[in-house]
Amino acid sequence: MTIAVYPGSFDPVTNGHLDIAARASRIFDTVIMAVFDRPNKQLLFSTEERVALLRESTRHLPRVKVDTYSTLTVDYVRSVGASVIVRGMRAVGDFEAEFQLAQINQTLAPDIDIVLFMASHRYTFFSSSTVREIASLGGDVSWLVPGPVVEALKRAYGRR
C-alpha cells in the first residue's frame, strides 16, 4: 500500500488543491492532505478551521485523509508510513521553488520520492492568497473554492 502526503497550509483550500488530491488519489492508495501548523505564519484560518474545511471539502474523495503536523515534512511523512510527497505546480514560476524544496527534502530523506503534479489548466492562474484577496474585497470566489470555504471566507471578512 502506497501512502502519499500532500502538505500545505491550505489557507484556504482551493479547487486547485482538491484537483491535485483527487488525481493523486487515483495513483496512490491513500493521500494525506497534511495541514502544516505554523503558528509564526500569518494565516486567515486557524489550524482547526483549515482541517475542518479540508475534511468537509474532501468527503467525496474516499482515499484522501486530513491531518496536521508541525515538524519537518520528511519527518511527518515517515511517521505516517508514507513514501511519497505530492506537490502541485501551477506555472513555470512554481518550478524553481518546488525544485529547491524537492532537493532539500531528497537530501534530508533520500528514501522519500517527490511527485509533482501539473495543475489542470483551469487552476493555473490562482492561489490561496489570490482567493483571500478577492474575497477580502467582496468578490465572488465560488468558482475558485469549494462551498464550505466560500461561506467561511464570507464569515472571516464579515460578509453575508
Curated annotation (Swiss-Prot):
Cofactor(s) for this UniProt protein: Mg(2+)
Site entry: Transition state stabilizer: H17
UniProt-annotated location(s): Cytoplasm
Catalytic activity, as annotated: (R)-4'-phosphopantetheine + ATP + H(+) = 3'-dephospho-CoA + diphosphate
The protein's name: Phosphopantetheine adenylyltransferase
Top EC class for this record: transferase
UniProt record similarity statement: Belongs to the bacterial CoaD family.
One Gene Ontology biological process: coenzyme A biosynthetic process
Name of encoding gene: coaD
Amino acids binding ATP: S9, F10, H17, G88, M89, R90, E98, Y123, T124, F125, F126, S127, S128, S129
